[in-house]
Amino acid sequence: MKRTKWFGSDVCDICHARISTVLYDAKTVHGPWATMCPRCWKDNTYQRLGVGLGQKYVKNEDGDFIKEEA
């Protein structure tokens, strides 16, 4: 099984905090997509993931964010 690794920034586009364990790459309720921490994802999205909505990445033991399959 191929695992998708996140190569983007680990800083939340909304609150600018460094993301430590769970990262979301998702569409916001305002239209544009953003890299978000869990709190900002909850506050600024429709809280759904999938095609056209967003993806969730979880940090593994090597320190890489890996896409979590739905």
Question: What are the residue ranges of the model-derived segments?
Answer:
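N-terminal first-folded block
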Residues: 3, 10-11
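Short linker/helix segments within small regulatory modules
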Residues: 24-34
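Cys/His-rich Zn2+-binding "zinc-finger" mini-domains, especially FYVE domains
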Residues: 9-10, 17-22
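Short Cys/His-rich "knuckle" micro-motifs
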Residues: 21-25, 47-50
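Cys/His-rich microdomains that often coordinate metals
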Residues: 19-20, 35-36, 44
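Flanking scaffold residues of small Cys/His-coordinated metal-binding clusters
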Residues: 6-7, 32
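Short metal-binding segments enriched for Cys and/or His
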Residues: 38-68
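Short cysteine-rich clusters marking metal-coordination/redox-active sites
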Residues: 12-15, 37
